[in-house]
Amino acid sequence: MWRNILGRASLRKVKFLSDSSSSGTHYPVNRVRGILSSVNLSGVRNGLSINPVNEMGGLSSFRHGQCYVFEGYATAAQAIDSTDPEDESSGSDEVNELITEMEKETERIRKKARLAAIPPKRVIAGMGAQKFYMLKQRQVKMETEEWERAARECREILADMCEQKLAPNLPYMKSLFLGWFEPVRNAIQDDLDTFKIKKGKIPYAPFMEQLPADKMAVITMHKMMGLLMTNAEGVGIVKLVNAATQIGEAVEQEVRINSFLQKKNKKNATDKTINTEAENVSEEIVAKETEKARKQVTVLMEKNKLRQVKALVRKHDSFKPWGQEAQVKVGARLIQLLMENAYIQPPAEQFDDGPPDIRPAFKQNFRTVTLENTKTSRRYGCIECDPLVLKGLDKSARHMVIPYLPMLIPPQNWTGYDQGAHFFLPSYVMRTHGAKQQRTVMKRTPKEQLEPVYEALDTLGNTKWKINKKVLSLVDRIWANGGRIGGLVDREDVPIPEEPEREDQEKFKNWRWESKKAIKQNNERHSQRCDIELKLEVARKMKDEEGFYYPHNVDFRGRAYPIHPYLNHLGSDLCRGILEFCEGKPLGKSGLRWLKIHIANLYAGGVDKLAYEDRIAFTESHLEDIFDSSDRPLEGKRWWLNAEDPFQCLAACINLSEALRSPFPEAAISHIPIHQDGSCNGLQHYAALGRDKLGADAVNLVTGEKPADVYTEIAARVLKIMQQDAEEDPETFPNATYAKLMLDQVDRKLVKQTVMTSVYGVTYSGARDQIKKRLKERGTFEDDSLTFHASCYAAKITLKALEEMFEAARAIKSWFGDCAKIIASENNAVCWTTPLGLPVVQPYRKPGRHLVKTTLQVLTLSRETDKVMARRQMTAFAPNFIHSLDGSHMMMTAVACNRAGLSFAGVHDSFWTHACDVDVMNTILREKFVELYEKPILENLLESFQKSFPDISFPPLPERGDFDLRKVLESTYFFN
């Protein structure tokens, strides 16, 4: 460009830099020199392809770090005289035109120079770009190819068996899967072949045709086993309607993920929507189109063109959502084929000369249940597995496909209701559980309004975790040796007592009772074993990863949860002990202090209620035990097993031991998340809402020498009232008898559950049952009638003590209940918007029934009706509203911590960060709590009710106290 511009100037013989020019002609000269001298090409050489020009005096060469202006051109131009009279008059315009072009070119070079000066983005999500894209490819494969991988593994093993003519030595459950795979796959394929003959006559045919038979077989087997492991009805049994729905959902999901492979063009049979009939297109054509699409996707994947891949999926994803009716029809048919073709055979030594005992692995049964608090009973179909399948169920986790594993790279940022988190697996920002009104409101809410919620969920999802290999290794050792340690369930069943002779009716009656108790205990153990196996299998899958992430979403109230269901930080002590932050930070002086406090908190047993200095003293007095726990966790004194949270305590012991043994303890690296927990957090929110001084004192909204314990204070109030009642005359005051009996029973543990659940609107009957359970555990009274009446009295006194201490909370709860009652009486659901802009709709509506005829039986699907459950809307509003506030506080804290450079994880009312950052997090969480409650929350709520329901008259807001919220900023034990 420069060559062209200056070349044109020389050809026109423009005398534009002559010494004899007038003052007017010096303007272009100065302008040119200004342009040329201002072009800072420093450092551009590497970024741009600019070759030096050596003509007409030459362009001085560019040097790295320097810039020379075009001095030679000025000299040459001065030597040129015009020989054309017309050039004299037109020269000025020509020069200006050339200078304008030079200015444009200069700006272009400057722009390129600025871009070249910016280093390329070689770090993404804290890792090199190449590594990030490699992990991204793995993540996409994890989401899209797991079922295909499982099916391929079965095919390969079967092919290998045919070739070798030998049965491979496989684990028990894997051999079952393999034995079922071929007959189930063939049965499904027979169905698919039949569909081609009976076109349009089988209602579920168009759905099943969209996936290969082997993949449907694998999905059916794995989903069924997963449901039998984790189902609410008990291990080894699952409601047919639940199983059919979930298997149908899984098949639909896999069709959706892989739709671009079978829907390459609209002429293909599998491009039909659910309302169209499949055309008889040859398998060869479908295979060619599938392979073509597969290659296209592979090329895009190799180039990290994920957006193009997703666009391709959307382009070919033309089918409509199936709907629950279609899902259960597909699921029921697949379950039927599984039951008809999956068999099990006891080991050969279990039978003598007779034929082998081959029997179905699964069978359909019917159960009758009485609905809670009613005399109505309902019969439902269920699927049960054979005892031999049940026997291996708790060992099957390692052979199962587990969907929604933690992600290898940060989740996609949330940008819409179903846009965010996973790349291909369906992800929704809110768990609506089929509540149509909530789903509709969420979809209609402007993105800008939801930005604070999205940012908080993205922040939680971007926290990087890893497996604590030392703790996992120990857990595996304990589990391999039968469990029973650190809260792990016994891997062996309780022996069932032998049946006695029926002549002795008393013995037989006792045997039936003991047998029933043993069977129940074994079922509970089995369920716990399955749960632990699933958690450990996820840990084993992720242990060699450098790090991983948990995408989060919210429930309808706005509380955040990880999408992955098994191994996450919201789980048990086992989960939390196995997990740690991926990033390590030096402890520092403050971090070393907090690590010691953390050990005392995890040990608990009253130690966690002491002042901080006393907790530190406790830890320091047990350093020998801590070192021993770290060095010889099983062979030593096992001090860590006495902790309330043993595996988390062990992880902290290992970290503290490493730090104290290093030359510079404060420089030791820590990955342990340190917890700061709220003090009966629901009551903290009530005290702040009501500006309640007495309540604020009880739940640490104001500072004290040591943490206030609300449970102990309530117990003390209860005891004081009972002491007064015990002095009354039983003749005139019958409760005096129960007061005397209860005096020795009142303690923190007796009232704790009732105080905790008071936030959730615990009723008198609920409190009575809680206290009765505690008394039965202690074996206080042999007479059941006496236990019942004593519990009634104690519940009444406990609720009275709570109302006295938290008067403002009681008034606010009553106001919540009154408002909800009025709204629900008009057949409206209670709705509100959280301080972060999340719309909340209470989902409690009377269920309707929809009958669906399947190949197994007529199934009853639950359908939401327009009629609200008025009482549930009323009783649930107070706790749901408080939960929406604690969710808002956690999200506000998460975002602020992230902006301050802290790693953050949250479990509702428990906030976690690195030891060295606890002080900063403590400051932030207090500031955010004050910021939250400085807003007119109740006033805004009332205003929203009045706008939504203008024809309803609402009661006035309750009176509030004069507690100074700013005191929270100075409260040492607000969260501790």
Swiss-Prot record:
Compartments where located: Mitochondrion
Keywords, A to Z?
Answer: DNA-directed RNA polymerase, Mitochondrion, Nucleotidyltransferase, Transcription, Transferase, Transit peptide
Record InterPro entries: DNA-dir_RNA_pol_helix_hairp_sf (IPR024075), DNA-dir_Rpol_C_phage-type (IPR046950), DNA-dir_Rpol_phage-type (IPR002092), DNA/RNA_pol_sf (IPR043502), RNA_POL_N_sf (IPR037159), RPOL_N (IPR029262)
Q: What family is reported?
A: Belongs to the phage and mitochondrial RNA polymerase family.
**Any idea which residues are catalytic in this one?**
677, 752, 909
Organism from which the protein derives: Arabidopsis thaliana (Mouse-ear cress)
Q: Where is the transit peptide?
A: 1-42
Give the UniProt record's GO annotations in the biological process aspect: DNA-templated transcription
What's the top EC group for this one?
Answer: transferase
The reaction(s) annotated as catalysed by this protein in its Swiss-Prot or TrEMBL entry are:
RNA(n) + a ribonucleoside 5'-triphosphate = RNA(n+1) + diphosphate
Kindly indicate whether the keyword Nucleotidyltransferase belongs to this entry: yes
Molecular functions (GO terms): DNA binding; DNA-directed RNA polymerase activity
UniProt EC number: 2.7.7.6
**What job does the chain carry out?**
DNA-dependent RNA polymerase catalyzes the transcription of DNA into RNA using the four ribonucleoside triphosphates as substrates.
Name of the molecule in the record: DNA-directed RNA polymerase 1, mitochondrial
Q: Which gene encodes it?
A: RPOT1
Cellular component, GO annotation: DNA-directed RNA polymerase complex; mitochondrion; plastid
One Pfam family for this entry, by name? RNA_pol
Query: Matching PROSITE patterns, A to Z?
Result: RNA_POL_PHAGE_1, RNA_POL_PHAGE_2
